[in-house]
Every structure is written in C-alpha cells, then in structure tokens.
C-alpha cells in the first residue's frame, strides 16, 4: 500500500525513480509523483492515475542526481493531483513523501500549525509543515526532524529533501516498511527491495523509530536520541527476472502458471535428507506445548487459514480458531492458558496482523509467521517463521501465495501430527507431488476456463459461490478473486446456508458456481444446486474426478480429498482472470486495491 523510492548519486535520478515506482505498482496506488534536486531548487512532478501519465509530464531536460518518489493509495483525502505526494512546506524548502497514517495530525495542526495555509487534505502535509515550523525555532535540520517525529503518533515511512542541503536525503520509519540500498558511489531508499534491484542488491533493514541520513557516499543511522547505529547490509535473494512478466500478458496469469513449481519447491525445502517432512524442532515444541492454536490473517490469507484449521484439526487433532486480524484486537476471545499464534501474510507487512502480533507479544505468547518475505516486519517480530518459497508475487490478486500457504499449512499439520503420534492415511509429500501434477493439467486447460468465464460471467452483475465443508472456504477465495479483478459482486456461502436468506437473491440467470470435491457432502451440495436451479439460477458445477455427475461444467483431476482445495482453486483463479479480461478490467492493478496493506 503506497510505495517510496529515493536515489542519490551521479546518475539521472528521474529515470531511476520512475523505474523504481513502476516496480512498486503491484502494491496498489491511485496517484504518483517524484521530486528531484535540480540546479535551481527542488522540482516536483505529480499526477493522479498511472505512472505512465506521470512520465509524460517529467521534463527530460532537468538534470538531477538526487530525488524521491511515491505512489499513493488514498487514506486522507480523495485521489487527486493536489493530494498526491511529494508535498512541500510553504517556503518550498522541504519536500516529503510518506507512507502510513498520522493519527494525531489534526491535533498537531491545531497546536503547532494554526497559521499555516494547507494545500492538500492529507495527513502527510502536516509532517512537512511541522518540519518547517521546527526549523524556524532555530533547530538544525536533524534536530527538527527528530522533534517532528517525536510529535507524531501513528505509522510512517518518510523520505525528505532539504533544498538548502541538496546532497542528502533524510529518512525515517515507524511501523511501515522501508529499506536503504547500498551502491558504489550512490545509495537508494525503497519500500521494498524489488523497487531498486535495477541498481543494487545490497540493502540495510531499518528498525522502527530510526532516522537515516543518506548521502552519495555514506549512510548514517541514528535512533531518536541521536545515537549512531551500525548495521551491515544484506543481499536481496531476488533476481530482476523474477519481477518481469516475460512472455505473459499479465503477472496474474504468470503466477497462476507458476503454482506447480511453487508446490514442488516447497516440498523440496521442507524435506530432510531422507525425504521426510522436517520442521524446526523449536516450532514443533512450541506448538506441542500449547493448548490451542489461533490463526490470525486478512483476505486471501484468512481463507488459507480456514483451510489450515481443517488440516491441523484433522491431521494433528489440535483445536484451532481462525480470526480476521482487523477485528481480533477489538473482540479478542477468552484465550486459553497456553495459546500459540500463527500469523499468515504474503507480504509480512499487513498492518492489521502486525497490530495483533504486537498485542500478543506484549502478553508473552509465542507466535509463528507464515510469509513469502522472510525478514519482513511480521517475520522479525514473531518468534518463528515458515517461508512460502513462492517467489515474488506482483499481481494484486493473490494466487500462488494462497496455494503456497495451503501447502505449508498442510506440512505444518503433518509435522505436528507425526510428533504427537497421529498417523496419516496418506504420504503427504507424495500427494503434494500429485497436486503439482494436477495443477499442470489445469493450467493447460485455459481455453476451457475462458469459455466458462464467457458463458457465466462476461455480462453478469453478480455471482454466488457455494460449497460444503472445506469447499465452502475455497468458494470464499473464489468469490474474492472474482470481485477483486472483475468488479462483479461475488459472494461465497456455505451450501446449507442458502435457504436461510441468500436464496432470496437468486433470479433468472444468476450464475452460481458450486464446488463438489468432498465425497461426504457431495449429495448435499448437489441438493443445493437443485434448489437454486429451481429459482432460475445458471449453475456451474466444478467437481472432483470420481464425484462427477452428468451436467457438471468442469471435472478436476483426482487428488487426495484433504488436499482438494489446492487444485479446486485453480479453475476459480483462471475463471476470474478471463472474466476480468472479457470485462476489460485491469487484471494486475485492480481499482482501489493494494497488494501490501500497510495501514490499519
């Protein structure tokens, strides 16, 4: 959610900043801007809309080797050119970009900035105006920066230019991700490493409430007390090709096709030398010492958590609760005596999940993060991490991270089951290999998926997904995918709940996508399909081989029933993708959405 880049060196800063912002497009944004230190002062370019539009207004003839850039996802103030970053102080001495939310910005306005005329509706402008006010009291820029930050409550990642000190960028962070990249006679700033892989793979991780003075040949990290901190850079384990589409028209389609490889990679990463599943002994012991597992997540990760609950309870016979992170803090249940928390987040930066983690850490409870980004905030602040090994996921709508989460959760459940002496009736690694094979088959059936999307979804206003048992949870994820990228009003329901109200919405032609992968509820979901057909619905039944019946729209390759969610979701991802194409929607960057949701 939002993205920051910065560059200081000898090269053309404008192009590096623009390319960096393009690499951050996946995070979601509605406007973008850059500011560069030119010969006659700081020049700001910003636009509502795509970075391509911003490129059109950037003057190629302006020479600059220092600058900052930003993609904005609106929180305070509508998406507009005025509200886009960078923002400047009244005198234009200071120019600033900011990710996060300043919770007390109105109070700061009232107490310190009564005489300032504000240009935008944003909380961000308060920071840059406060910076100017603090300098006006006689403080040095560094002192003013520290004072300014001490007066702010909330989250921030900040990049600041000072027109009177053009050879440095001031940087700070609190509860919002930010890295400093190290180069040869240049340095960079970025919300994540992908933005600046074009110039370096060496990055320094910043901690909360740290200030950094970035110059061409040096990086100085200090705490809010002004004490210098030494920290070595790390090498980003990414390749520039990982964040390119290659021959694919969209990242989403590329990432759907990568899922078989991801599953095989996960199997390999979590096997010991004997081919047995083997997790960290400390993770296993911490879970075995607990009396209940609490899974905390948002969105797609929450849906993965629902399936994960089934894995853990069925395999390991341990009780599990799954909670939406944004509600957990306000409605925390009565916890058991020895709870263990699992946080699921693709980015590892989800603000709602982090807020809960902070609470449970303060309570002294052990926590595990399942994430695609080791070294992320959740990974650092939890006791343990299980990586997804899915590779960068660029499309806003999650696909391969979801199936990776399911695979890792199944491995975790099997490992705990083994430690408890619970015997599975199947070989998990073998069956996951069959899942990967089935995924390959499904990814080769794109024409069939396109035809289903055209038949059922090309012109509809709404759509319902139904399933029983674990198919219900897969249906929730299918509905989310469809609404995210095609803007169809799509909802997932438990098949048995239709008659308790939702069936009132069924009318002639309403598409209902039904999942039938579980033998013990196959007849039940078939009965639900008949109920909606009787009211005029247009049914699309996706069943598992061996459970299919005449009239089914698509039959999945057979896999072990427990792992059916990993294959059942593939057609739903592809159908959503093609529905979005038929409706001429922006598949990789859907409106109003952000990939990494870093505000609460």
UniProtKB/Swiss-Prot annotation:
GO (cellular component) term, any one: cytosol
Major site of localization recorded for this protein: cytoplasm
EC number: 2.6.1.16
Example GO BP: protein N-linked glycosylation
Domain Glutamine amidotransferase type-2 per the UniProt entry, residue ranges: 2-217
Catalysed transformations (reactions): D-fructose 6-phosphate + L-glutamine = D-glucosamine 6-phosphate + L-glutamate
PROSITE patterns: GATASE_TYPE_2 (PS51278), SIS (PS51464)
Active-site feature positions: 2 (nucleophile), 595 (for fru-6p isomerization activity)
Subcellular location: Cytoplasm
Protein keywords: Aminotransferase, Cytoplasm, Glutamine amidotransferase, Repeat, Transferase
Boundaries of every SIS domain copy: 283-422, 452-590
Heme listed as a keyword: no
SUPFAM superfamilies in the cross-refs: N-terminal nucleophile aminohydrolases (Ntn hydrolases), SIS domain
GO MF entry, a single one: glutamine-fructose-6-phosphate transaminase (isomerizing) activity
Lineage top rank: taxon: Bacteria
Keyword Cytoplasm among UniProt keywords: yes
HAMAP family documented for this protein: GlmS
Record text on subunit structure and interactions: Homodimer.
Alphabetized PANTHER family for the sequence: GLUCOSAMINE--FRUCTOSE-6-PHOSPHATE AMINOTRANSFERASE, ISOMERIZING, GLUTAMINE--FRUCTOSE-6-PHOSPHATE TRANSAMINASE (ISOMERIZING)
Role description: Catalyzes the first step in hexosamine metabolism, converting fructose-6P into glucosamine-6P using glutamine as a nitrogen source.
Protein's name in the database: Glutamine--fructose-6-phosphate aminotransferase [isomerizing]
């Amino acid at each position: 959610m939002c993205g920051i880049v910065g560059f200081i060196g000898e090269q053309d800063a404008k192009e590096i900043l623009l390319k960096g912002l393009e690499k951050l497009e996946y995070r979601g944004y509605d406007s973008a801007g850059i500011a560069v230190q030119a010969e006659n002062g700081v020049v700001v370019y910003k636009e509502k809309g795509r970075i391509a539009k911003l490129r059109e207004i950037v003057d190629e003839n302006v020479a600059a080797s220092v600058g900052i850039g930003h993609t904005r996802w609106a929180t305070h103030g509508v998406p507009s050119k005025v509200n886009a970053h960078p923002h400047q102080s009244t005198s234009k001495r200071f120019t600033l970009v900011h990710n996060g939310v300043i919770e007390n910005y109105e109070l700061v306005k009232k107490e310190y900035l009564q005489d300032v005329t504000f240009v935008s509706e944003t909380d961000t402008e308060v920071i840059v105006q406060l910076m100017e006010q603090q300098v006006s009291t006689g403080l040095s820029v560094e002192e003013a920066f520290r004072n300014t930050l001490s007066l702010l409550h909330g989250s921030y990642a900040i990049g600041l230019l000072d027109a009177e000190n053009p050879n440095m960028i001031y940087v700070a962070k609190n509860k919002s991700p930010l890295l400093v990249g190290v180069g040869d006679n240049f340095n960079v700033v970025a919300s994540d490493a992908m933005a600046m892989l074009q110039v370096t793979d060496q990055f320094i991780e910043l901690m909360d409430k740290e200030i950094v003075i970035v110059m061409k040949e040096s990086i100085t990290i200090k705490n809010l007390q002004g004490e210098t901190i030494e920290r070595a850079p790390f090498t980003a384990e990414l390749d520039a090709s990982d964040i390119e589409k290659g021959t694919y028209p969209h990242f989403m389609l590329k990432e759907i096709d990568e899922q078989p490889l991801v599953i095989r990679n996960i199997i390999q990463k979590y096997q010991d030398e004997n081919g047995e599943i083997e997790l960290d002994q400390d993770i296993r012991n911490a879970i075995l010492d607990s009396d209940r597992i609490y899974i905390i997540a948002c969105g797609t990760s929450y849906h993965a958590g629902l399936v994960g609950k089934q894995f853990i309870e069925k395999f390991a016979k341990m009780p599990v609760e799954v909670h939406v992170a944004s509600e957990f803090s306000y409605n925390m249940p009565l916890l058991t005596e020895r709870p263990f928390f699992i946080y699921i987040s693709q980015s590892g930066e989800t603000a709602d999940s982090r807020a809960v983690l902070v609470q449970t850490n303060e309570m002294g409870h052990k926590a595990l993060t399942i994430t695609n980004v080791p070294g992320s905030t959740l990974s650092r602040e939890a006791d343990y991490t299980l990586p997804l090994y899915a590779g960068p996921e660029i499309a806003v709508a999650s696909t391969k991270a979801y199936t990776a989460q399911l695979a890792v959760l199944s491995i975790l459940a099997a490992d705990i089951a083994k430690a408890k002496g619970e015997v599975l009736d199947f070989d998990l690694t073998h069956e996951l290999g069959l899942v990967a094979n089935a995924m390959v088959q499904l990814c080769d059936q794109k024409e069939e998926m396109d035809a289903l999307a055209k038949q059922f979804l090309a012109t509809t206003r709404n759509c319902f997904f139904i399933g029983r048992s674990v198919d219900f949870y897969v249906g929730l994820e299918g509905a989310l995918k469809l609404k995210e990228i095609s803007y169809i009003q799509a909802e997932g329901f438990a098949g048995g709940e239709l008659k308790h109200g939702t069936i009132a919405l069924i009318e002639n032609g309403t598409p209902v996508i039904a999942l039938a992968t579980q033998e013990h509820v196959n007849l039940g979901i078939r009965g639900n399909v008949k109920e909606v057909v009787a009211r005029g619905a247009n049914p699309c039944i996706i069943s598992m081989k061996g459970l299919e019946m005449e009239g089914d729209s698509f039959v999945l390759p057979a896999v072990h029933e427990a792992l059916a969610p990993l294959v059942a979701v593939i057609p739903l991802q592809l159908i959503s993708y093609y529905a979005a194409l038929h409706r001429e929607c922006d598949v990789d960057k859907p409106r109003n959405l952000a990939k990494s949701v870093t505000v609460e």
